[in-house]
């Protein structure tokens, strides 16, 4: 694949998405966008050579919007990285917990810190924003608190401790390239989306394609299909090099067993 000169991620600067982008493509010029759909748009329209998105958190699970976008957009995951997430509570200097009436952050960050918020800020309204870094602008409100801030700014006080429910908190990020640039020919992990036939045993039939060949599943997650109430799309990650005849055979059999089947990523 071509070199990465420009990489898109969720902004503004100072987010974990920016850190993941520096990690996955350290030489790239980073372009920040306000929403995840805008990140995908930049990649598809050629304004960036690659994009970086969070896809799963070890506490809060899949980043559902990005799972849904990856399934329908013209992008494919070609690399991944897992970053340790250290969430702090940010306030203006001198603000006490009892004075905080609103807590702002991305839905994922608030979900990852639910126990702390339930215990110490049960009275505070929880308001979702597009990104944790963008929430910092809201600290002009005296009664505001921000979850997830990890960069210091003038007049901002950070909690001394990580407030996440679990201290071993990691988020997986994908490096995306345009699907038209081709799929990697090698990679020890394959990520795909599948919709099984709506009949007894169809999911078992899909999973048997891999179990019968000793191929391990490292992730399986279901998402409702909005246009078909009561039916689900499965997002599945397997351990296996896509260049292996055994893995290719399993994927081909899985494709034939499903109503729809789409490979979303091949990476190490």
Predicted feature residues:
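Domain-level signature for soluble enzymes in the chorismate/prephenate branch of the shikimate pathway
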Residues: 1-268
